[in-house]
Amino acid sequence: MKKIIQNILPLLGLFVLIGCATPQPQVTRYAWVTGLKPDKAERYEDLHAHPWPAVNQMIKACHIQNFSIHEREINGQLYLFAYLEYAGTNFDADMKHMAADPETVRWWKETDPCQSPLPDAAAKGKIWSDTKEVYFLP
């Protein structure tokens, strides 16, 4: 009996540790699209080739990871596609926090004039149009 308990005890301890482990936040994927003004493309690319450290820090502080922006020309029009993963627990609150950051606001004043919102976003006073995920392979 003593030998059985000695063999089972470490397993029980492992199960307790696994059960008490802090759960990792669920990651939510987001993607958007917008137009890019051809005469502002070089400026936009230069800004993102040399992002401001405070802006990158704010993005990370707001639980954003694996953030990327891609550019594509389609029929003579430039488009931007943005993708990110959100690992926080309150996306709206984090976005409000980011929007209240003076350095981020200053950054957006540099990048927004480079972009050309699609009609649905423009109608809402937004820059980026939401997209719908149609496939994901974890």
Q: What are these language model-derived features?
A:
Residues V16-G19:
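C-terminal motif of bacterial Sec signal peptides marking the signal peptidase cleavage site
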